[in-house]
Amino acid sequence: MIWHVQNENLILDSTRIFMKAFHLPLFDGSFIFPEGILIFGLILLLMIDSTSDQTDIPWFYFISSISLVMSITALLFRWREEPRILFSGNFQTNNFNEIFQFLILLCSTLCIPLSVEYIECTEMAITEFLLFVLTATLGGMFLCGANDLITIFVAPECFSLCSYLLSGYTKKDVRSNEATMKYLLMGGASSSILVHGFSWLYGSSGGEIELQEIVNGLINTQMYNSPGISIALIFITVGIGFKLSPAPSHQWTPDVYEGSPTPVVAFLSVTSKVAASASATRIFDIPFYFSSNEWHPLLEILAILSMILGNLIAITQTSMKRMLAYSSIGQIGYVIIGIIVGDANGGYASMITYMLFYISMNLGTFACIVLFGLRTGTDNIRDYAGLYTKDPFLALSLALCLLSLGGLPPLAGFFGKLHLFWCGWQAGLYFLVSIGLFTSVVSIYYYLKIIKLLMTGRKQEITPHVRNYRRSPLRSNNSIELSMIVCVIASTIPGISMNPIIAIAQDTLF
């Protein structure tokens, strides 16, 4: 009798444990509904691809786009909810993480229309391209909400693997293969360095992997000012530096930008920086809270090197994509200012605001490059000479996006930089802000050089590419032009829109 009672109690306890273990992921899964929509979209794409023919190609774009739009909608409906830590501490939802997830989804939503005509012209496989884009987006979203060292390592690897495959998507292109090999080798090395830094952090905290628990562990073990934390800081900074691509971790960027398909470059140029910025902000602000006197000077050096080298080397480039690669290195230097300033002086809000404008400016520029490349087959800056005489709309759109990237008033880029530099100045980063102002002037110089070429009417400067330029019918490139128009409008928003955007960004801070 006693044996039967004990046996029944054991069965009941086992059942409760099983139900609790089953209920936990099911309950937590309801809080990652935006990510779940993307996963469902991925499965649907695979199912349709395995049962359809080439006539169903428009459905692939529709499913991908609607999945991203629905994910954005679900994310907005979740706005203002209480912060939650899910999946036994692996994932955290709060407004700060969600605004970065929104930016990543926005990037992907704008990038897919840029790819439609390009993929058809280059005869690339469509389904795989969309699968890689959605999977990379999913990895970036999980990285934004990652709350422990394992997830912070696995999520960017998901993003990176898709990035490697996308950069080498044109397999017959030698430059694309070279770019992929460099990207893969540098990415593998940086991941090894990053996980080595995590091992120092894990050991110093007494075996903790959650970000907040690492802080508590460092306090308990009295290791928060130890040499081990300094070593971890250096290795983690180098590992994250590859994702952000500041100088001197920028060597892969120009080659990958030049060799990869242009829509892929547009996608990588914004999503990788948004996801890495979200991760870097949380890592530096939480586990290395007690080491701010060490990582502030370290990031200042990276920001100065990025702003100077990126903008100076961009002057000498002859390829539009290589020029934008070095320009992006300079741009990440400005973003680092916001990370250094932190929450105290509105640094995070200014960083988020500037990244929102940077997405529109950069994607608008790449949309123009994709259109010009499809119609002429060239990427050389000199071949843009006289474009205004053949296609004023495209030339003006490119000019507006470049001027906004340079930070000329009254365009959006000017007000984004102004707020970012003002927050840096209030935080006492006078030298860093001065370097930022100087390099912004330098960037305006090489952007104006390109705009001068666009507007020139002298026949001796116009190359055969523009002389034989034929504008495609409206129905042919309407998806690219739609993305371009949206980005150009967002890049030219006057400063009157800054206050509500900054207010929303400030409300998201943790």
Swiss-Prot record:
Role summary: NDH shuttles electrons from NAD(P)H:plastoquinone, via FMN and iron-sulfur (Fe-S) centers, to quinones in the photosynthetic chain and possibly in a chloroplast respiratory chain. The immediate electron acceptor for the enzyme in this species is believed to be plastoquinone. Couples the redox reaction to proton translocation, and thus conserves the redox energy in a proton gradient.
Quaternary structure and partners: NDH is composed of at least 16 different subunits, 5 of which are encoded in the nucleus.
Recorded superkingdom: Eukaryota
NCBIfam families, alphabetized: NDH_I_N, PRK02504.1
InterPro entries per record: NADH-Q_OxRdtase_suN/2, ND/Mrp_TM, Ndh2_N
GO biological process, one term: ATP synthesis coupled electron transport
The enzyme's E.C. designation: 7.1.1.-
Protein name from the UniProt record: NAD(P)H-quinone oxidoreductase subunit 2 A, chloroplastic
Cellular compartments per GO CC: chloroplast thylakoid membrane
